[in-house]
């Protein structure tokens, strides 16, 4: 299933015409920013996180850096895992299976579906679902995306 999703993502990116300049971290002026907890030369994938309330429900807003947005357009999980580690360094209480699944979904599809969306919002109250349901729900299983 994941291979099918990855191939679909590549096809969508090809159809959208993402240029090699967009996919080149060297072209990003923020590429030299330090990674939280990483070596000073590591690019920062997550700019910052912020907890918010949606009604009475908590939501973690993850603000990817431009380097992170560019990296999320590439296949593979190494950068996604590094970005998730940055999220956990900033917001350790986000360390749940459901929050990670939402983050990975946003990592793989947000820049295709909604390029430049300011934050990727993760909620601890959303159910843990399989990959196909996560994708069908737009990375927001259980109810529509919150409207902040």
Curated annotation (Swiss-Prot):
The keyword Signal applies. Residues 22-45 are annotated as: Disordered. It comes from the Bacteria. It holds the Pfam family DUF2599. InterPro entries: DUF2599. One of its GO terms (cellular component) is extracellular region. Keywords: Signal. Residues 1-23 form the signal peptide. To M.leprae ML2452. This is Uncharacterized protein Rv0477.
């Amino acid at each position: 299933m994941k291979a099918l999703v990855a191939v679909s993502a590549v096809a969508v990116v090809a159809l959208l015409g993402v240029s090699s300049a967009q996919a080149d971290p060297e072209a990003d002026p923020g590429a030299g920013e330090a990674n939280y907890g990483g070596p000073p030369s590591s690019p920062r994938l997550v700019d910052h996180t912020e907890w918010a309330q949606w009604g009475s429900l908590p939501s973690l807003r993850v603000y990817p850096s431009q380097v992170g947005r560019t990296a999320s357009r590439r296949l593979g999980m190494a950068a996604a895992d590094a970005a998730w580690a940055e999220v956990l360094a900033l917001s350790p209480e986000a360390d749940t299976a459901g929050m990670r699944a939402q983050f990975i979904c946003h990592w793989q599809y947000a820049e295709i579906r909604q390029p430049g969306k300011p934050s990727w919002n993760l909620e601890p109250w959303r159910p843990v679902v399989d990959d196909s349901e996560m994708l069908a729900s737009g990375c927001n299983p259980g109810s529509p995306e919150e409207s902040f």
